[in-house]
Amino acid sequence: MITDLTFTQLRDKLKNKELSSLQILRAFKDEYEKDLKHPLPLNGFVEFFEDAEEHAKKADELIAQGVSFDEKPLLGLPIAVKDNISMAGKLCTCCSRSLQGYYAPYNATVIDRLLEAGAVLMGRINMDELAMGSSTEFSCYGPSRNPVDRARTPGGSSGGSAAVVAGNQAPFSLGTETGGSVRLPASYCGIYGLKPTYGLFSRYGVVAFSSSLDQVGLFGKEAADIALGLAVMAGKDEKDETSEEADFSSLLKLSAYSKEEIASLKIAIPKEFLNTQGLDQEVKQVFDELCAWLTKNGAKLEEVSIPVLEASIPTYYTLAISEAASNLSRIDGIRFGLRKDTGKGNDELYIQTRSEGFGPEVKRRIITGNYVLSKEFSGDCYEKSLNVRAKIAQGVNEVLQKYDFIICPTAPAPAFKLNEKVDDPIAMYLSDLFTTFVNLARIPSLSVPAGKTKAGLPVGIQFCGKKFSEDRILKLAKAWEEQNA
């Protein structure tokens, strides 16, 4: 079936004129519409764009006219987009009641780059409200479901983006990540998910959660899919001063590491993660099997201690909620989105709009974030967390000066059941136990589907590298993929 093909395979079919863009789009749309009739639909798309077919037809016309894939590397390929990334003239609600009716007036830079490369935008994708959550249960459109087991979460906050790719409703999707929101869903759904180096992709046009941590991320079914998206989206953007120059155009054709190249690698395994009580033994077994494969190919693996990693979760959440409290003050009922005007003045307008517009998890984080930023506690909480973040980054980068990669499980356990942790925020936050250090250190990390539990639940292992080493990470992932297909 067309929908079983990877993003890279579909590109080859388009290049060879074996399939048209319209055929591809309609195949995925049919899967989406068929799933709507399922007793437990995935609920990945919150909107499938009506004009997508028109754009697919235009792509087919360009292909017929001889426009090359060198000029437009993603010509005719459909892509699904998380609902917090601006697409001009389209709703951008972040799956929050507070932003219902808000249409983006411009494109995010990453969207412009995809369109310039010829991609076709399929639709908006479900997410945890304002990107706050680890299960996609905090969405005003209802939860997304995991296509592997529909009683379970696809992860979050980009769970819808992972679900549509794993569920064959889209070949490729964009998510965003602040503390694990791409890698966690990728692990739970059994696909690839990349959190790039901070600054590799522009954040212009992405609704901010935590500005010092947020990054756009990518989902695909194989390593080469991620490489394609990375090649066209990376690089400096004058509209985002945190973006940096980077050229990954060579990744349009991804090659795997040879056995000799793998044999030259030194790889670090953080002891702190392997010795935690929360690590599921079946996840540990999958990790051990991947380590055995690396050792068999000659790589040198060593356990290392980075004690400060144990502070990753509290440090991450302290900083993230503080920045969220500041960033989300703009959603006030005055300029855009929901407006609940009682005629009793602006203070009452703010209170009513935000009380009705925000869900419980967003309220929890905003209230806690404002507490952290208050005059009495900012020194003890926020400023100390900034110092600990710097120590985490220093510790991780010192290891990466001696080793090529850090590897560890993406999540301590496989996907949990829907409603299992929705009323237990601490348990939910601990889903990010192995991911947040990457965001705090601003390094790249790829979640690689590495195996399954006895119950058939996917397990992801993450490959983490130095800043801007995405090409090397993807080469290693492709080698694993080719030898374990």
From Swiss-Prot:
HAMAP family reported in the protein's UniProt record: GatA
Gene name linked to the record: gatA
Active site: K82, S157, S181
Record's keyword annotation contains Transferase: no
Name of the protein in its database record: Glutamyl-tRNA(Gln) amidotransferase subunit A
EC number(s) stated in the UniProt entry for this protein: 6.3.5.7
Xref: InterPro entries: Amidase, Amidase_CS, Amidase_dom, AS_sf, GatA
Organism: Treponema denticola (strain ATCC 35405 / DSM 14222 / CIP 103919 / JCM 8153 / KCTC 15104)
GO cellular component, one term: glutamyl-tRNA(Gln) amidotransferase complex
Stored NCBIfam families: gatA (TIGR00132)
GO MF, one example: glutaminyl-tRNA synthase (glutamine-hydrolyzing) activity
UniProt subunit comment: Heterotrimer of A, B and C subunits.
